[in-house]
């Protein structure tokens, strides 16, 4: 498949996303955006679960497969199942010559360059940006977003590089905070709304890089059990998004 302006095609009203690990968190983030900006029905799946259960397929569905390498075994297996059921498929990948890109109907490359470290930081940012832009394009095409709002959101995207640079200037502050929790045996990342996927990704990054137990959880569910597992020395990163009551 070749890179394709996906929003220029007549697609259905059901969008399904699949990925593993970081890619799954990208899909979860995109679900919030698509439901808000496009008024489309969106479902997400962990690819390793999707491939091992019986699935119902609707002809108007588009399946989006997110993978940094484009070679994730479970994600490719899920793609193969969808292809065998004649579903429309789209790949969001970093490597456009990959198997997942090759066997998808559409390709949306993230162009992040090689991911050197264990933590897939560049790819995560690239994935959510591509999915956000797709949501904006589809929302505009479906007249769910006014032209002025669309332009403002694009302007905000262009400001991101500068904001990232400012964040990196706080390296010393982050070092000081991390030393406070150096002896912690576990961490809990809490998030609500858009920040819930970020909490999941933050917990995954801590596990991957520090080999410290960490858990991401919806902030509203903290009181239903998880709060009993943590004592005062355990760090809790709380993030919230303003969402309708």
PLM regions: where:
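Single conserved hydrophobic/aromatic residue that forms the stacking wall/gate
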Residues: 1-15, 230-245
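Pre-Walker A segment
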Residues: 9, 13-25, 42
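Active-site phosphate/pyrophosphate-binding segments
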Residues: 9, 13-16, 106-229
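Short glycine/serine/threonine-rich phosphate/pyrophosphate-binding segments
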Residues: 23-29, 71-78, 100, 195-200
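Short, solvent-exposed amphipathic alpha-helical segments in soluble enzyme
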Residues: 30-36, 59-60, 79-83, 106-107, ...
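Glycine-rich oxoanion-binding loops at beta->alpha junctions
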Residues: 31, 35-66, 213-228
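Phosphate/diphosphate-binding loops
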Residues: 63-102, 106-123, 128, 136
């Amino acid at each position: 498949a070749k890179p394709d302006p996906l929003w220029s095609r007549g697609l259905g009203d059901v969008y399904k996303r699949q990925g593993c690990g970081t890619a799954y968190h990208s899909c979860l983030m995109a679900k919030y955006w698509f439901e808000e900006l496009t008024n489309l029905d969106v479902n997400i799946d962990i690819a390793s679960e999707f491939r091992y259960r019986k699935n119902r397929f609707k002809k108007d569905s588009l399946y989006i497969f997110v993978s940094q390498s484009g070679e994730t075994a479970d994600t490719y297996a899920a793609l193969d199942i969808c292809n065998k059921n004649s579903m429309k498929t789209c790949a969001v990948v970093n490597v456009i010559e990959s198997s997942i890109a090759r066997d998808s109907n559409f390709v949306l490359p993230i162009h992040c360059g090689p991911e050197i470290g264990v933590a897939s930081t560049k790819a995560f940012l690239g994935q959510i940006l591509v999915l956000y832009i797709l949501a904006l394009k589809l929302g505009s095409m479906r007249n769910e977003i006014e032209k002025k709002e669309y332009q403002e959101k694009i302007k905000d995207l262009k400001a991101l590089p500068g904001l990232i640079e400012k964040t990196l200037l706080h390296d010393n502050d982050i070092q000081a905070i991390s030393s406070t929790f150096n002896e912690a045996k576990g961490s809990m990342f809490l998030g609500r709304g858009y920040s819930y996927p970020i909490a999941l990704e933050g917990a995954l990054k801590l596990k991957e890089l520090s080999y410290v137990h960490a858990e991401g959880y919806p902030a509203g569910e903290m009181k239903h059990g998880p709060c009993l597992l943590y004592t005062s020395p355990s760090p809790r990163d709380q993030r919230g998004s303003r969402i309708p009551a």
